[in-house]
């Protein structure tokens, strides 16, 4: 079949087999351009060409004919710009905080001056270790647990994500490793918060393993509604346990920078959770009976 590809003010006719998929179209049109940069849309049946919302993005999991593309159809091409792999973004953004904290902890004299450096107190040692363990866990999950439905994201996202994580890591690391750091007055609070953080990290890991098991592998875009005790109150317990872990860290260290990171994470994860919760409701209306991220609240 012949399909006309519209790109701005120009157009080009490409020939495809009748059972072609989106990948076939991407390979034929502008073959020198990376296929991950290419996006194609088709006008919904009866839609207005001047209405952007009337266009449907073609899905790589379905044949083009199943999505309304036939001989003589027109599709609209968009260059998504330079792309970078999802896994690469995660590895880089999580490696930064780990490297920053280790640099602070290993060479405090370079940061604070050799004349005022003193031995770390118990709380500092404990929470430096927990901070590093958290991001080591994230790196291991990125390599061995997470399965990404999309292969790439815009390259600019790696800068945005790194600025977020690395900036907070600079603030948290500077305060936690500082010779002027004052640990909480209650050793019980310090230890109880550390235990709580470990528990929440393990629960977060358990959720990630369950979610990973629901997908066949990278590129699998199916989103079945997760079930089980961890999902009994909220749709996204991984975000809940992530936030609770940082609440525990903040309580145990009593640092404003940590509370700032926790609050920023809460805002962002709440947005993601609400979006996922709404998608789950479309699949299973009974999901309305629970909240998105915070039990009984949100």
Curated annotation (Swiss-Prot):
**GO: which molecular function terms?**
oxidoreductase activity; oxidoreductase activity, acting on the CH-CH group of donors
Q: Please report the record's description of how this protein sits within the membrane.
A: Multi-pass membrane protein
Record's keyword annotation contains Transmembrane? yes
Give the subcellular location: Membrane
| TM helices/strands, residue ranges | 162-182, 189-209, 229-249, 254-274
Output the superkingdom of the source species.
Answer: Eukaryota
Q: What is its main location?
A: membrane
InterPro entries (alphabetical):
3-oxo-5_a-steroid_4-DH_C, SRD5A/TECR
Which BP terms in the Gene Ontology apply to this protein? very long-chain fatty acid biosynthetic process
Q: What happens when the gene is disrupted?
A: RNAi-mediated knockdown in tsetse fly procyclic form parasites results in growth defects in low-lipid medium and reduced fatty acid synthesis.
Enzyme class at the top of the EC tree: oxidoreductase
What EC number(s) does the entry state? 1.3.1.-
Q: Which pathway, metabolic or otherwise, does it act in?
A: Lipid metabolism; fatty acid biosynthesis
Query: What would be one Pfam family of this protein?
Result: Steroid_dh
Keywords attached to this entry: Fatty acid biosynthesis, Fatty acid metabolism, Lipid biosynthesis, Lipid metabolism, Membrane, Oxidoreductase, Transmembrane, Transmembrane helix
Q: GO cellular-component terms in the record?
A: cytoplasm; glycosome; mitochondrial outer membrane
Provide the family line: Belongs to the steroid 5-alpha reductase family.
Q: What does this protein do?
A: Involved in the synthesis of fatty acids.
Q: What is the name attached to this protein's record? A: Putative enoyl-CoA reductase
Q: Which gene encodes it?
A: ENCR
């Amino acid at each position: 079949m012949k399909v006309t590809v519209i790109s701005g003010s120009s157009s080009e006719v490409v020939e495809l087999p009748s059972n072609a998929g989106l990948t076939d179209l991407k390979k034929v049109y502008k073959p020198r351009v990376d296929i991950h940069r290419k996006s194609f849309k088709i006008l919904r049946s009866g839609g207005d060409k001047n209405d952007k919302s009337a266009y449907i993005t073609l899905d790589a999991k379905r044949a083009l004919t199943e999505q309304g593309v036939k001989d003589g159809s027109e599709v609209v091409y968009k260059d998504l710009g330079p792309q970078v792999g999802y896994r690469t973004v995660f590895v880089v953004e999580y490696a930064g905080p780990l490297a920053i904290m280790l640099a602070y902890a290993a060479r405090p004299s370079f940061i604070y001056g050799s004349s005022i450096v003193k031995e770390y107190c118990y709380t500092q040692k404990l929470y430096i270790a927990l901070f590093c363990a958290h991001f080591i866990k994230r790196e291991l999950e990125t390599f061995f647990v997470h399965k990404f439905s999309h292969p790439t994201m815009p390259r600019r996202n790696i800068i945005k994500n790194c600025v977020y994580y690395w900036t907070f890591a600079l603030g948290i690391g500077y305060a936690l490793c500082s010779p002027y750091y004052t640990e909480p007055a209650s050793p019980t609070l310090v230890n109880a918060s550390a235990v709580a953080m470990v528990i929440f990290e393990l629960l977060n890991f358990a959720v990630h393993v369950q979610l990973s098991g629901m997908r066949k592998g990278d590129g699998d875009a199916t989103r079945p509604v997760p079930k089980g005790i961890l999902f009994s109150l909220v749709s996204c317990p991984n975000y809940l346990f992530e936030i609770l872990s940082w609440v525990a860290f903040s309580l145990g260290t009593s640092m404003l920078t940590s509370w700032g990171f926790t609050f920023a994470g809460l805002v962002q994860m709440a947005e993601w959770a609400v979006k996922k919760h709404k998608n789950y409701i479309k699949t299973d209306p009974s999901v309305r009976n629970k909240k998105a991220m915070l039990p009984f609240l949100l």
